[in-house]
Regions:
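Zinc-dependent deaminase
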Residues: 1-22, 86-138
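A short, polar/acidic, helix/strand-boundary loop motif
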Residues: 2, 45-46
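Small-residue (primarily alanine) positions within well-ordered alpha-helices
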Residues: 12, 16-19, 29, 55, ...
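Short, basic and Ser/Thr-rich N-terminal targeting/leader segments
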Residues: 23-27, 73
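Short beta-strand scaffold segments in enzyme catalytic cores
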Residues: 27-35
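Short beta->alpha transition motifs characteristic of CBS
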Residues: 38-45, 114-115
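A short, polar/charged loop-to-alpha-helix boundary motif
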Residues: 47-57
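Immediate flanking context of iron-sulfur cluster ligation sites
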Residues: 69-81
Length: 138
C-alpha cells in the first residue's frame, strides 16, 4: 500500500499525463496542506504562451487562490520532475515547507551556464527605492 508521498505523486503523474495529451512536456504538480490537495497544475507554456507556466507555478497559483494568500506556509509540493531554479524561487517566496520530486532533471546543471548574470548596475538607487518602500510599510 502506498504512503502519502506516493499517493500525492500519483496525482501529480495523472496531471503530467494530461500535459502530455496537450502536447506539453509531461510534468505535473500538486500542493498539499494538512493532507489535502489545494492546488494542481501541469506544464502549459505552449498553450498559455507563457514561459513561466510550469506545473509548479500553475499549482502554486491555484493553491494561493484557494487560500486567498500567496503565503503557503507549511504546504508541501509534489512534482514529477526536479524543479528548475525559477520554480524553486517561487516555492521559497510561497514559503513551501517541503518539496518532493520524482525524476531528476538532467538539464538542470547545463542551464546554469546558459545565462550571463551581472549585478551592481545602479545598485544604490535600486537599493534605496526598496529601503524606502519597506520603511514605509513598517
Amino acid at each position: 500500500m502506498d504512503g502519502p508521498d506516493e499517493q500525492f505523486m500519483r496525482r501529480a503523474l495523472e496531471l503530467a499525463h494530461r500535459g502530455r495529451q496537450e502536447g506539453e512536456v509531461p510534468v505535473g504538480a500538486v500542493v498539499v496542506v494538512d493532507g489535502h490537495v489545494i492546488g494542481e497544475g501541469w506544464n502549459r507554456p505552449i498553450a498559455a504562451h507563457d514561459p513561466t507556466a510550469h506545473a509548479e507555478i500553475q499549482a502554486l497559483r491555484a493553491a494561493a487562490a484557494a487560500l486567498g494568500n500567496y503565503r503557503l506556509t507549511g504546504a508541501m509540493l509534489y512534482v514529477t520532475l526536479e524543479p528548475c531554479d525559477m520554480c524553486l524561487g517561487a516555492m521559497f517566496h510561497a514559503r513551501i515547507a517541503r518539496v518532493v520530486y520524482g525524476a531528476t532533471d538532467p538539464k538542470k546543471q547545463v542551464l546554469k551556464s546558459q545565462v550571463k548574470i551581472e549585478g551592481g548596475v545602479l545598485a544604490a538607487e535600486c537599493g534605496e527605492l526598496l529601503s524606502e518602500f519597506f520603511a514605509a510599510k513598517r
